[in-house]
A protein has these predicted regions:
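Contiguous transmembrane helix-bundle modules in multi-pass membrane proteins
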Residues: 194, 213, 335-348, 352-481, ...
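Membrane-interface coil-to-helix junctions
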Residues: 30-133, 155-177, 270-275, 282-309, ...
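Start-transfer (signal-anchor) and selected internal transmembrane alpha helices
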Residues: 1-38, 243, 247, 430-446, ...
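Membrane-embedded helix bundles of polyisoprenyl
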Residues: 27, 129-143, 147-232, 244-267, ...
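A cross-kingdom signal targeting lumenal/periplasmic-facing segments of multi-pass membrane
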Residues: 105-109, 517-629, 633-663, 692, ...
């Protein structure tokens, strides 16, 4: 049995309890060491980045939402699927499904108060890791691996680089670690002719928990099934393929149907998101990456921009070397390891397995599972070598050490320590002929545990990578997002109408959803595509469209988006947008600092009317600042002829500027070449415009990196010393891989920065137009210098300074808001109110458009219009009207029906065989 793989081995129940007990004890020990590292440094498992900004707010909110949903079920009320406090308003299911809205484990949030969600999040991380080990052991034992080998493999898998580096930052990344082994076990059941219940349940669990990892797991499951089928039947028994294929596909569809309640709505939203379907560039990996990857096989390190956390422990990688040292054994495993390693080295594979999106090896948990399985497989005979096999192992070890450390990127202290432990363990197994089985097991177990501790210390230790510094103390998450959040001040306001606020203080992103206030920030992976389009049209200086904070003090936008108040420190009122009153209407002491609330004197109400429309053709021809100006004169509609054409009365000018180049060559009308880092383009305005809001506008930006060495002639290179020449060559060896660039702006009224992500960046969202708002100042902008920090070709369709007079903004806003929605009620998935209009008009409601919205006017269904690219609209005739918008998640009804049907089918599949068996017994 040891010479085969992927063949079901029945009867492996012996010692199951002892194995689980041993695993539990060792897991507790190693997890305790992990936790102790954090405790000794005064930190929790809450990382300052994505954990605090996305996963923690999700879990707090989800617990509250579940409790509300339970009350709705008990009272017969409608369940909320739309929330006005998520960004500018968002669908709850599609926004949060990526973070575990369908994950059964996250249902525990319903029983935990928000204040204790931090502890729940930490507990779920530990629980998921523990379950990953149990799932791995079940799979390993099913395939005939020894108990001790399975134990070692489980520890190696659970404490590999993937959970160490990614599992705490993105807790949802741990989901496939326990779901995927269950999917493989279910597939084994189908091959063995057993019940498909586990297969269906595992697919449903994975798809419910996270749609992206379900996609990855499904692709890898197909590869696994091909390998198993080839091993079992080969090419000579293809007649068995159709019935097997029918079973695999049919039962998989049942599992997918069960998950459809979240999967179907999310898929519909995903296909329309800003990140989906973009044309991206996929650059080859640098040559040294192969060596760096090998060097870090024995560590918890090896960070790169592609999430390639492939490290395990020295003992585990020794298992891989032993596997290859023994010829004519475990051929399928060898092919699998080489195949997956090849995929890690091909960027296109990272793109395909990441949902045909940007390059990311987030499937690397499957590679570490394979390595852990290899360790479990070779463990029983790890000291039994033929002379030739010993020579093979020694040669492989030597080649590994030479290859892995031949480049500097691999010669880290942690990698060298991992290699040293690998060599020591290899020497032991080569010389352990006379050592007892218990002795060998003790050394291997100690080596495995020591490797885990070394990896934890190397990554989190303050003397090493010091990753623990990225985490925050216990209680920090609740304090910063809720208890001491500056937005708590808004709860003291007496204004009970619907309004948004902007923030000029340090407020955690996504925290408004925890306080039930309506902000202007958002950071979740899926976002409203129409809102993204509007921001793109307006040139918002946010290169990542699903991560935005505020409206960058652009006065017309603050008005158009209904921002009625701003949070600001009393000593920083000079930073307020132009039409905000400097007299605070509310103030409070929050977290040791004073926070005040300042009103916008020109904010539009949530529902206002436009009597004129701007055609899409006219609107698209405007510059970003002209667009925001035009929206104060009418409404942009996709339909034509509903309203008279608007007369654009705004006053946005672009003063003529003289361009001066320093270290930059203009190749053509739009292309500028900076041969060296730090080139400058200076625009000098002969007739500056005063008393306005001033912005710098970039349109059609693109960037192609070049090496500064290419611009140096032979004479310049020869004048340099050999050392300096090699240093420059090394510095710019991978210039072509640059995936982002920024423009540094220097002017007489302030400094700024515009960031641009190239198509080869994982953060690329198709943005090429940007506006940097300098705001208003006592003096006009006279000169601005654009610093090009890196050598390369910069393409700008347009570089300009634009100045917008604000004299008429308040009056035009007052005209739009003269006939507005009154007695506004925000209900569950609904917004309604009353309005009286004197002319034919379009009611614009500042909520993101979605096909899930419907509207009635005076009880009669009407067409929901897409207004101003991203908002809701409805046409109204003169008179008094009652308007009611209602939201239903697109695809939710169909998804729920499919889920119900899937559950019924699963129950039937489970029950029918049992009933038949019972019936047969009765007949006998």
């Amino acid at each position: 049995m040891q010479n085969t793989i992927l063949i079901h081995a029945p009867g492996r129940r012996q010692g199951r309890g002892a194995l689980v007990l041993a695993y539990t004890a060792l897991f507790a020990l190693l997890m305790g060491i992990w936790a102790a590292i954090f405790a000794l440094n005064g930190q929790s498992f809450i990382q300052y980045g994505d954990t605090l900004k996305q996963h923690y707010p999700f879990l707090v909110y989800y617990g509250r939402w579940l409790r509300q949903a339970a009350r709705c079920v008990l009272t017969g009320a409608a369940m909320p699927t739309w929330d006005f406090s998520i960004g500018y308003g968002a669908d709850i299911i599609t926004t949060l499904s990526y973070y575990g809205l369908g994950d059964p484990l996250d249902l525990l949030a319903a029983f935990v108060p928000g204040r204790w969600t931090e502890q729940l999040l930490e507990g779920l991380i530990v629980l998921r890791l523990y379950l990953a080990g149990l799932a791995f052991m079940a799979f390993s034992r099913r395939h005939g691996n020894s108990r001790f080998g399975t134990l070692l493999g489980a520890l190696a898998y659970v404490f590999s680089a993937w959970p160490i580096q990614a599992g705490l930052i993105e807790p949802v990344f741990l989901v496939p670690m326990y779901c995927f082994p269950l999917m493989l076990l279910g597939a084994d059941d189908l091959f063995e002719g057993r019940s498909p219940v586990l297969y269906i349940a595992a697919i449903a669990l994975t798809a419910l928990s996270n749609f992206l990892f379900f996609y990855m797991a499904a692709v890898l499951l197909v590869l696994y099934a091909i390998a198993v089928y080839s091993k079992r039947y080969g090419a000579k028994n293809l007649r068995t393929l159709p019935p097997l294929l029918a079973k695999f596909i049919g039962f998989a569809l049942v599992g997918i149907a069960i998950s459809a309640v979240t999967l179907l709505p999310t898929a519909q939203e995903l296909f329309g998101s800003a990140r989906f379907g973009l044309t991206r560039e996929t650059a080859p990996y640098p040559f040294y990456r192969f060596f760096e990857l090998l060097a870090n096989m024995t560590t918890g390190m090896g960070y790169d921009a592609y999430s390639t956390y492939a490290g395990v422990t020295s003992a585990t990688f020794l298992g891989v070397l032993v596997l290859f040292a023994k010829p004519r054994q475990n051929t399928v495993l060898k092919c699998a390891w080489l195949g997956l390693l090849a995929l890690l080295l091909v960027p296109q594979a990272g793109s395909v397995l990441n949902g045909i999106s940007y390059v990311s090896n987030r499937w690397v948990w499957a590679f570490t599972m394979l390595e852990a399985f290899i360790l479990a497989r070779v463990c029983p005979g790890i000291t039994a070598f033929e002379p030739k096999e010993k020579r093979n192992l020694f040669a492989l070890l030597a080649v590994y050490c030479v290859v892995a450390f031949c480049v500097k990127q691999g010669r880290t202290e942690t990698a060298l320590l991992g290699a040293l432990l690998l060599v020591l363990l290899a020497v032991f197994v080569l010389a352990a002929d006379g050592v007892s089985r218990r002795g060998v097991q003790a050394v291997l177990l100690a080596g495995c545990c020591l490797g885990v501790v070394m990896n934890l210390g190397g990554y989190y230790g303050i003397e090493e990578a010091d990753a623990v510094n990225e985490y925050r103390p216990a209680g920090y998450a609740w304090s910063t997002t809720v208890q001491d959040n500056p937005a708590v001040t808004l709860h003291l306001m007496e204004d009970q109408s619907y309004w948004r606020y902007d923030s000029l203080v340090n407020e955690p992103i996504n925290s408004p959803m925890l306080l039930d206030v309506y902000g202007t920030g958002y950071f979740f992976s899926l976002n409203n595509s129409y809102l993204s389009s509007l921001f793109r049209e307006l040139g918002q200086n946010t290169p990542v469209e699903y991560d935005y904070r505020g409206l960058q003090n652009r006065t017309p936008l603050e008005t158009l988006f209904g921002v009625k108040y701003a949070l600001c420190a009393p000593d920083s009122t000079g930073a307020l947008p132009a039409l905000f009153d400097s007299q605070a209407v509310q103030a409070a002491e929050i977290g040791g600092s004073t926070v005040a609330v300042y009103p916008n004197t020109a904010a539009l109400p949530i529902g206002y009317t436009a009597q004129n429309q701007i055609s899409r053709e006219t609107y698209d021809a405007l510059t970003p600042l002209q667009k925001q100006d035009a929206l104060l004169d009418g409404v942009v509609l996709e339909e034509t002829g509903l309203l008279p054409e608007a007369e654009l009365t705004g006053d946005t000018v672009s003063p003529a500027a003289e361009m001066e180049l320093d270290g930059v060559q203009q190749l053509d009308e739009t292309t500028y070449y900076a041969p060296q880092d730090g080139g400058r383009i200076t625009l000098t305005i002969a007739q500056p415009v005063a008393d306005c809001e001033t912005a710098f506008v970039v349109q059609g930006m693109q960037y192609t990196a070049t090496s500064p060495l290419d611009a140096m002639n032979e004479e310049e290179l020869s004048a340099m010393s050999a050392h300096d020449r090699r240093s420059l060559q090394k510095q710019y060896a991978h210039f072509w891989r640059k995936d982002s660039v920024y423009l540094r702006l220097l002017s007489n009224i302030g400094e700024g920065r515009i960031e641009y992500n190239r198509p080869n960046s994982q953060y690329y969202c198709g943005r090429h137009d940007f506006v940097y708002n300098f705001g208003t100042s006592d003096e006009p902008l006279q000169q601005i210098t654009i610093v090009l920090p890196f050598a390369g070709c910069y393409q700008f369709d347009r570089l300009a300074v634009e100045c917008q007079k604000l004299d008429t903004v308040a009056a035009r806003a007052e005209n739009l808001g003269a006939e507005n929605l009154q007695n506004v009620t925000l209900g569950t998935n609904s917004l309604g109110g009353e309005i009286t209009t004197t002319r034919s008009s379009v009611l614009v409601v500042q909520l993101p458009y979605s096909t899930g919205w419907s509207v009635t006017v005076d009880g009669t269904p009407a067409q929901v219009l897409r207004a101003d690219t991203a908002f809701l609209g409805v046409a109204l005739e003169p008179g008094s009207h009652t308007v009611a918008f209602t939201y239903k998640t697109p695809g939710l009804t169909a998804g729920a029906a499919l889920s119900a049907a899937g559950v019924v089918l699963l129950a039937a599949i489970w029950a029918v065989p049992a009933l038949r068996k019972k019936s047969k017994k009765r007949r006998k």
